[in-house]
């Protein structure tokens, strides 16, 4: 059977297409998936003890003679699609085994997502619906529940059912006429009896800008030099040193001969 076209924007007191069947469903139970529920090694959904009684109402015998017990549910998103899960019990542990792994892989379920079961009292059918969170954790603590992408402290059972995303009654619209383009039907979240709590939006933290260090090199002014002349860094006064006298030995006696001036006269000022 082909799926129905998408729902209109409003369901409660709003517009419903002519080719849709409105099904009133009663919420049975739900579970926040744990890593063991979506593991490819086990491929089983463990049912909590407080919901075992409601699960047994869904269990039917597949084969009367030596058969096994199964749970037949209808997909709440795809019209006319049935899922068959094998019921298995061991050491007071109730779980759904064969068929659950295919459902989890097709829906892309991960730890932290929610799966819920419904019952239609009018037609006697059972439905399964899932809600994938945007941020699913790989592991969740057993003392907390994940609702709308946020981890909260454990609450009393009545409070948990009141805040459950699928608690109370839900309205499901199914398509009756065949359609060329298959589109999954959607639930009317406005008729679930609770408003979807949006997590508080935290403003983004501004990232501090890194300051770039810039180094500017100022060229030194060129030195004014004259071709062929050395550069004088510091001027000093020139002091003339008196000439040194010559010492001559004559007949065993040393005689100091004073230096001569440019005019040929002997100098009186000299260093002996």
Swiss-Prot record:
UniProt key word Cytoplasm: no
Subcellular location, record wording: Nucleus
Chief location of this protein within or outside the cell: nucleus
Residue span of region Disordered: 189-227
MF (Gene Ontology): DNA binding; DNA-binding transcription factor activity
UniProt cross-references to SMART domains, sorted A to Z: B3 (SM01019)
Keywords: DNA-binding, Nucleus, Transcription, Transcription regulation
Residues within the DNA-binding region(s): 30-134
GO cellular component: nucleus
Pfam family, one: B3
PANTHER family: B3 DOMAIN-CONTAINING PROTEIN OS02G0455900-RELATED, B3 DOMAIN-CONTAINING TRANSCRIPTION FACTOR ABI3
Name of protein: Putative B3 domain-containing protein Os02g0455900
Organism: Oryza sativa subsp. japonica
């Amino acid at each position: 059977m082909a799926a129905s076209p998408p729902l209109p924007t409003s369901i409660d007191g709003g517009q419903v297409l002519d080719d849709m069947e409105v099904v009133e469903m009663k919420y049975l139970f739900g579970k926040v998936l744990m890593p063991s529920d979506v593991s490819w090694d086990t491929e089983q959904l463990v049912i909590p003890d407080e919901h075992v009684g409601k699960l047994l109402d869904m269990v039917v015998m597949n084969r009367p003679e030596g058969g096994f017990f199964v749970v037949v549910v209808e997909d709440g998103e795809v019209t006319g699609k049935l899922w068959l899960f094998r019921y298995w019990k061991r050491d007071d542990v109730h779980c759904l085994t064969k068929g659950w792994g295919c459902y989890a892989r097709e829906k892309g379920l991960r730890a932290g997502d929610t799966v819920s079961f419904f019952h239609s009292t009018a037609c006697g059918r059972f439905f399964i619906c899932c809600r994938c969170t945007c941020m699913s954790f790989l592991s969740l603590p057993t003392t907390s529940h994940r609702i709308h992408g946020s981890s909260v402290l454990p609450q009393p059972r009545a409070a948990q059912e009141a805040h459950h995303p699928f608690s109370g009654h839900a309205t499901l619209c199914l398509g009756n006429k065949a359609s060329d383009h298959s589109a999954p039907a959607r639930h009317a979240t406005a008729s679930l009896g609770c408003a979807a709590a949006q997590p508080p939006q935290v403003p983004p933290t501004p990232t501090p800008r890194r300051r770039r260090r810039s180094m500017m090199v100022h060229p030194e002014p060129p030195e004014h030099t004259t071709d062929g002349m050395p550069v004088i860094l510091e001027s000093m006064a020139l002091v003339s040193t008196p000439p040194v006298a010559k010492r001559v030995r004559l007949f065993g006696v040393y005689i100091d001969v004073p230096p001569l001036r440019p005019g040929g006269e002997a100098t009186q000022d000299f260093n002996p």
